Amino acid sequence: MSIFANKTLMITGGTGSFGNAVLNRFLDTDIREIRIFSRDEKKQDDMRHRLQERSPELASKVRFLIGDVRNAQSVRDAMHGVDYIFHAVHGVADAL
């Protein structure tokens, strides 16, 4: 059992290269839920389809949320119930 057992993880920028790597690292673990938080609905849809083709069971652990890290309220809403966050967004330092 790991520290991530039965926990919820959120990946900001989850459809990018680093976000994909984080998702793949945790997908086949005892984590309860992985939230992908990103602005790009098309990339989320593509990722959802790839996960479904790979394994419907694993795909059921992933929840997709459209949002922008520059919008504090959307981040707060998405974080409700989250135990760990991986921040995989690039290029927002000036916005924060």
Task: Name each region found by the language model.
Residues M1-K7:
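A short, basic/flexible loop-to-alpha-helix module at the beginning of a structural domain
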Residues M10, R35, L65:
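Conserved Rossmann-like nucleotide-binding pocket used by diverse enzymes
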Residues D30-D46:
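Conserved glycine-rich Rossmann-like NAD(P)H-binding loop of the short-chain dehydrogenase/reductase
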Residues I31, L51-L96:
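NAD(P)H-binding glycine-rich loop region in Rossmannoid oxidoreductase-like domains
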